[in-house]
Amino acid sequence: MRVSVSLVLGVGLGCSSPALWAETESPAELEVLTVTAEAERAEGPVQGYRANRTASATRTDTRIEDIPQAISVVPRQVLDDLDSARIERALDFAGGVSRQNNFGGLTMFEYNVRGFTTSEFYRDGFSANRGYMNAPDSATIERVEILKGPASSLYGRGDPGGTVNLVTKKPQAERFARLHASAGSWDRYRSTLDLNTPLDEEGDLLYRMNLAVEDSKGFRDYADGQRLLVAPSISWQLDPDTSLLVEAEVVRNRQVFDRGTVAPHNHLGSLPRSRFFGEPDDGKIDNNNETLQATLRHHFNEQWSLRLASHYKHGHLDGYASENSSLAADGYSLRREYRYRDFEWHDSITQLDLLGDLHTGSIRHQLLMGLEYERYHNDELILRSIPSRNPYAIDIRRPVYGQPKPPFGRDDRNHEEVDAMALNLQDQIEFSEKWRGLLGVRFDRYRQDMNATRLNNGRFRETSSQQTQRAATPRIGVLYQATPEVGLFANASKSFKPNGGTDMAGKAFDPEEGRGYEAGVKLDLLDGRLGMTLAAFHLKKKNVLTADPSNPGYQQTAGEARSQGFDLQFSGQLTEQLRLIGAYAYIDAEVTKDENIARGSRLLNVPKHSGSLMGVYEFREGWLHGADAGAAVNYVGERAGDSSDSGFELPAYTTVDLLARYPLASNATLGVNVNNLFDRRYYERSYNNVWVAPGEPRNLTMSLTLNY
């Protein structure tokens, strides 16, 4: 939406002399002055660091300050300032989000929000992490939005901590082109092109193309990778009330599978960060993904509109890898497992939403009634050696590569089919200027069919399982706008997530169930330049799979966990020249019931304290006019390094990054980013003491950006 102001000035109206008034037959009219500004849309660009609208929390275009829930938005400008090729660094500024298993560096397989790990994240409201999709590329991302607390009432199956929704770049009315090329430490090279143009004079047909090409060796020995991304999109205003948006993305990714470093005797730091424990001649894992998405919107009138959207993705991953398995008693001989993977998956999702904007007396209702259907197929083949028979060991102090490959002793083949249907009902209620409410519920029907075959040491075993789960996940929230600058809110909601497999009796497990409670305050500071959200939360999860003590080798749904604490996120302009984004979180997350893990054990990779701050100053005068200079600080507290909280932990760390941009010409900008300025040795994440991901040493990136 555009906002226009036209001014017509009559000179004669400003004259007080009757004689002069009589001499003027008509007022003199100056040229019409039109001031045009682009109003923010929930799926559109953000000016600076502060977003004011979102669709992630309600599936409607709503002001963030009107939603009774904590929402963190990390806009495109942050990704550009960081010069980050992936989105994980943006999540450092969301508050309460930490890193988890990244599947050997190939994917954003799991992450953690408010203490609970999840593998669910979304792309324009569609589940984006079915299968083993490549880690999202920043080239296509307009904003990263983090919805805190259970999101099942809107998105279905998930975990109670929260979820991430990636809002992709959409075609715009303006014609522009942006070419960005960068080169950095360890022979990292990357180029992106963002091209946007109207295809007709009326501006009804718009086209956008995003391209990315990447070749990176990285700081880890032998762990290099290449990526090619092509992402075209086109929007068509069919008539004043109807629009169609079609988006596609093709990714070709080749990368070495790398489980990281190890911690002999549970101690980190004795080995070089660059040391690789796979085999250089294993080659790379190929991960090819295709995504196609279409959205049709139609407005029947001012009150009612319809949204019909469909999303399809396909992926194929295959390749060999030698992976860390376990350390021998001496702490230096690392047993390894040789694996071959061949995975292929298809996922299709269709959504139909009817939206209404009605009044009952003085009360306004924004209604959402939605249907969703998903069909997912996944086929996995894993061949693996058996370390207990063929250790395939390597000395971590003096690794010698090129050993003969051990034979495959185990053959696992899995086939999974999922059919899921859901009904969404939601009412955003405006009782008055000060009071707002939110009611929502989702009804899910989930059916999963699994077939698995295993050949282990010459013995063949086939298992099949089927489960059908039904769940109703409500949420309720209320917001009180105490003053124009202060809003108080509270909410409660539920989540569910199906558990795969069966118990000793062959019965499908009950799904995990979560509950979340949140209360907080939203602040609008410095005349609207800076926004801040502070929220306290209490989350519980039950029916977590744990070992069945009566039947070794089987599981039961007896585990429970709890997370509580508070988090803070702020973003905006401290002054007209200084933009800021920052976050802090205190999280107390622990096991409250488990057959194997002690009560009170910390949850994996969850720091009690974490915080971040980035500030960028824009010069407006002198020879530095148009230049930027900034810094970012990120702190992560110590964390449990394995799921049993056995005493192995990752130490706390603080990193400092610097950035600068200098305009060489009106359309050319030179950029410099220095990451980990003080070269701190740190560890981002772990799964156990032989799967530990070290952080990058100090590194430099130079970039050139051309705008047309």
Swiss-Prot record:
Induction: Is part of the operon cntOLMI that is negatively regulated by zinc level through the Zur repressor, which leads to transcriptional activation of this operon under zinc depletion. Highly induced in response to airway mucus secretions (AMS) treatment. Its main location: membrane. It is a multi-pass membrane protein. GO terms for biological process: nickel cation transport; siderophore-dependent iron import into cell; zinc ion transport. SUPFAM superfamilies: Porins. Belongs to the TonB-dependent receptor family. This is Metal-pseudopaline receptor CntO.
